[in-house]
Amino acid sequence: MKKNIIIVRGGGDIATGTIYKLHQSGYPVLVTEIANPSAIRRQVAFSEAVYEKSYTVEGVTCYFAENLTRAYELLKQRKVALMIDPDGAVIREVKPAGGVDGILAKKNLGTTMDMAPFTVALGPGFTAGVDVHAVVETMRGHKLGRIIYEGNAIPNTGIPGAIAGVAKERVIHAECAGILYGEKKISDYVQKDEVIAFIYPDTQGKDASGQEKKDGAFAVRATISGILRGLIRDGYLVTKGFKIADIDPRESEYENCFTISDKARCIAGGVLEALLHAGILPE
């Protein structure tokens, strides 16, 4: 069994930045995920390995492992492994050198300091020195990526960080519950008010005043013009208010759809620094 394994809870786009950097820095990385990940920026989320069995981001491939034996085999081959383990039960068995909570749920879903000799959490919902050993700031701005050893990250405002002066409008949430199917694909340029997806309600016959319908479905429209940077998977069951899409207003930033973001890289740097400062070195 490899030493100094780092377990990262969550494989969304922000966590993927950390997974990528730790792997490239020489750490064996095991990712744990839920059975139905809901990443929006799917092109740069290792959580897609749950559905595709393997997924590559910027030249690094993450492989799905059905069990811990398979995960160890992958780690021995210096590959990133991912397991379905929503409760973090595998952590007790692996006894990793470090644990990272990259779920970004804005609350603690069960990560504790005793899960590993050193634990790090990304963003609000954790108190450094109580829940985990360190917290890394995830709010865009001057403090992004800063390591906190006492206290908390900046509280969640509910408003996304601004890109090209656009904040709240660039993220789209479901206006009703149902099963989503995209009309556009990630990297498409979309115009404001253009239909990008349809949500098919569980119960037929429901009405949503003012919403265009297609075979009983409700239209999801672009809130701004720009590049469709993120869109939840076809067939995903969403609830009202669920985050389903992300538009980048910068028309020239097509390649951003396929590369780890500046935000994710900055946060990853904070995690790497925290691990090194704690004396947890790559193999």
Predicted stretch roles:
Residues 1-283:
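Well-ordered secondary-structure scaffolds
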